Structures are given as C-alpha cells and as structure tokens.
Amino acid sequence: MHTLVFLSTRQVLQCQPAACQALPLLPRELFPLLFKVAFMDKKTAVLRELVHTWPFPLLSFQQLLQECAHCSRALLQERLSTESMQAVILGLTARIHAREAEAGTQPVCRKHTLRVLDMTGLLDDGVEQDPGTMSMWDCTAAVARTCIAQQQVGTAKPGLSPVPVEIRVDLRVNRASYTFLREALQSSVDSLLRLCCRDLRAEDLPMRNTVALLQLLDAGCLRRIDLRFNNLGLRGLSVIIPHVARFQHLASLRLHYVHGDSRQPSVDGEDNFRYFLAQMGRFICLRELSIGSSLLSGRLDQLLSTLQRPLESLELAFCALLPEDLRFLAQSSHAAHLKKLDLSGNDLSGNQLTPFQGLLQAVAATLLHLELTECQIADAQLLATLPTLTRCASLRYLGLYGNPLSMAGLKELLRDSVIQAELRTVVHPFPVDCYEGLPWPPPASVLLEASINEEKFARVEAELHQLLLASGRAHVLWTTDIYGRLAADYFNL
C-alpha cells in the first residue's frame, strides 16, 4: 500500500539530475521518505546526494527501511540491492571528503552533522543469493574497504576536522576476509570513519585470529558474539573465553562446535571447564546463550548457576542432555523467563520425555519459540506431550523437523494446537508414511537423507491445508522448509 505522498515522491525522483538539484530546496522532513523511495527504486545518484547532504545526526536503516505510514513494504526483510548499498557508501565517502575540504576554511556546523550511519539489522544470508543483492559478507567487505581507503586518504587533524562519522554494522568474518577486516578496525581508530560492530559472527577462524579481532572491538557497541569453529576443545575455549568475557555488557553469546568428552574427564579438562564457568560469571547483561557441546551433558546446572541474570533465549543443540539437566533447567530461575528454547539434536524419547514435559510446563507462560529438530519424537511421545505443549499459549513458532512423526500424529498436533492463538509457524517433518522401506525406529540421518514419495506427500500437504481451512487456521504456515527465514532471531521476538 502506497499513499499519495509516497507516489508523489516516487514521481519527483524519476529524473535524478533534477531531483539532486532540488534537494536543497526540499523540507528536511521529506528526507526519510526520499531515502526509502530512492533505495527501493535504485535511484543511486539521488541516494548518494541524500547521504552527502543528510540533515540529521542519525541515518538508520532500521528506521528508514521498515514499514511506514506511506509504504507498507519493509525492505529490511528482503535482501538489499547491491547498487543501493554501494550508493550509500559512496555518498558517505563524498560527504567525508567534502567536510575535510571545508574544515580548514570555515567553521564546521555541528548542529546538523551526520554522526552515525547505522547499517545494522540487514537480512542475513539465505541459502540462495541473488547476484543483484548484497549479502552480509559483501556488506562487511564493502564497509571495511571504505574505512581502509579513508585512512589512506588522510586522518583527522585536531582543530580542523569535522565530526567523525560512526558506521554501525553487523560484521561477518572468515579466513578470507579476516586480514582486511582487521586492517579496517585498526585504521578506523583515528579516522573520520569509525567502524563500530554491533553483532560479530566469525566462522572457522584460527584462535589467534579470533582473539586479535576481539581485542579490536569496542565494548560499548558490541551486542552479540557468534563464534563458529570447526573444532574447538576445552583448551581452546579457555583461551578464547577471557577475551569474550571482557565484554561484560554483552547480550548474546553463541559458541558453536565446542567439543569435549564429559564421560572421560581429565584433570586439565576439569580445570579448563572450571575456568570457563568462572569467566561466564562475569557477564552482567547476558540474555541469550547458545552452546552446542556434549561437555554440558550432566552438568548443565554448573553453567546456568554461574550466570548473573536469567536467560531469555537458550539454545542447547546436540548437547547430549540427560534427564537431570532438563529437571534442573525446569526448576531454575531461567525457566520463568525463557522466550526461546532450542533442544535440537537431544534425544527426548526415553527417560528424557517426562523431564522434558516438566520443562515445557515451567516455560509455558513465556515461551514464544520452540525448536525440537531431530529429537527422536515419534507419535507416542508427541501425543503424550500435547497437553503440556498446548499450554504454551504465547507460542509463535514450533520446529519439529527430523522427527519420526506420521500423518496421524501431525493431524493430532494440528487439531490440538487450534487453541494456541499466537501460533504462526510449524516446521514439521516429512511424515514417515511418505517414505518406503523405512527402518524403525528411523535414525535422524535416514529421515534427512532418504527419498520420499512425492505423490504421497502432495496428498499429505493437501489434507493439512484442508484441515487448516476447516479450523479457521489458514494463516498458520505449516511447512517442511528448514532453510527458510522462518526461525526468528532472539532480538526480533
């Protein structure tokens, strides 16, 4: 939906040279809408000039590219145009160069000086990448190169330079991009472009590089650290964690692929684990924790007891959780605050089922997002859990992919979940009825890799759709797409 003001603005920008000349004559109140229209329609010349002459201290993508009163389209929920993103960066560079040229000849007007360009909140990479759009990796590279280029042109001179511009971004780094990102962070310290990271995701970096990068980040800006290693043991974790823990106001910590054998502990391993726990106790604002590691098996209580405040999001995928881990979590102070819970890859069938049901009851009042991928939940376990599951009245998302459920089990879930008014998304497995020659009980690997009968599954989808229509729940998405952008980020819950 577009208002008359939006359509008029779009018409004004059709001729870019004329629009650029007219910008100084337009009320500054129109600039936010001008920016959104120019970004949406890839009016790159206008975009560059808008950034160059931006009349406000803050230029925020999250504010400007969301749904607004004049346009219902939320661009931040889409992959952003490479042309438009590059135009913004070029406009910022032109602005800095112009201010440098003016600084020695006339006083700098600070009242309407752009101080912050906030490019955070961009859609993260999907499975497929449109070549005409900019991924988070591309954005990181583009911003880093801009900061390096600015440093090579010149640094700020005391008494003459304009106010530096802070670029807030979410950074993604791997082995290929590490060197120039480190250089960008180093060069931005004394530059007119100050690189400020809100969320950091590092993939497959050596420990020394990870530490070096963490040492360059501004603790006042950082909100999330997401470290993804191919293989990090307890010893490596004990090296990394003190550099992470210096960000005491961190809100989200995600540690993936941390390996350790809790069944055969060594003296060094126990010392490293205790050191890790001590460092975790330093965080005073942590609200989200994600750790995928079997080292927590049987001692989840030790980790959760060290934290200074209750968590609102807890992801414990493939942690080999034991019944006592689930019981402790249910009785802990965290349970009453959890909005997001991910227990994927933990067997919730045998002895774990009853403690899991107790945990569901404990989190029912607050839970919005529940992920149970590959948890060995068959029809019997699902039916036994439904009375507790449906008490989660605020639940919006339920992930059950990779579980050995039949069509009959899915239909029971659909019928019983009608009372969950907030439920919007159910990611369900391909029913076992759609496989041929399936061993029982089927391992998760078989469910994920075996071929299904497409004709049978088409009938299943049609029947589920009819049931949703009949129950007045057509707005609820039932899907087998685990690679879509359906799982909400904690900060967007």
Curated annotation (Swiss-Prot):
Where on the tree of life does the source sit, at the highest rank?
A: Eukaryota
Q: Report the SUPFAM superfamilies cross-referenced here.
A: RNI-like (SSF52047)
Q: Which GO terms describe its biological process?
A: negative regulation of NF-kappaB transcription factor activity; negative regulation of toll-like receptor signaling pathway
Name of the molecule in the record: Leucine-rich repeat-containing protein 14
Which purpose does this protein serve, as stated in its record?
Negatively regulates Toll-like receptor-mediated NF-kappa-B signaling by disrupting IKK core complex formation through interaction with IKBKB.
KW Repeat (keyword) present: yes
Q: Which GO terms describe its molecular function?
A: kinase binding
UniProt KW keywords: Cytoplasm, Leucine-rich repeat, Repeat
Q: Where are the LRR repeats?
A: 111-146, 194-218, 219-246, 247-282, 283-307, 308-339, 340-360, 364-391, 392-416
Entry's Gene Ontology cellular component terms: cytoplasm
Stated family: Belongs to the PRAME family. LRRC14 subfamily.
Localization annotation: Cytoplasm
Using the chain's own numbering, where are the disulfide bonds?
none
Q: How does it assemble?
A: Interacts with IKBKB; disrupts IKBKB-IKBKG interaction preventing I-kappa-B-kinase (IKK) core complex formation and leading to a decrease of IKBKB phosphorylation and NF-kappaB activation. Interacts with CHUK.
